[in-house]
């Protein structure tokens, strides 16, 4: 349990450094693009599974 606490603490510190360092704006733009790319891929995968049967 202590291992997970340390891992999450390190992740929180990294997120804080990136968030307060100004990198968040660029990462948010990339995240929006990736969201729509993976949304389209998920829909294609679902439709492929439906029509395959």
Swiss-Prot record:
Residue ranges of the TM segments: 5-25, 30-50
Topology versus the membrane: Multi-pass membrane protein
Keyword set, alphabetical order: Cell membrane, Membrane, Transmembrane, Transmembrane helix
Domain of life where this protein originates: Bacteria
Short name of any one Pfam family annotated for the protein: DUF1328
Location of the protein in the cell: Cell membrane
Protein's name in the database: UPF0391 membrane protein BP1737
């Amino acid at each position: 349990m202590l291992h997970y606490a340390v891992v999450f603490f390190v992740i929180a510190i990294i997120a804080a450094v990136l968030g307060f360092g100004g990198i968040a704006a660029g990462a948010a733009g990339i995240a929006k693009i990736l969201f729509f790319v993976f949304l389209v891929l998920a829909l294609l995968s679902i439709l492929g599974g439906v029509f395959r049967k």
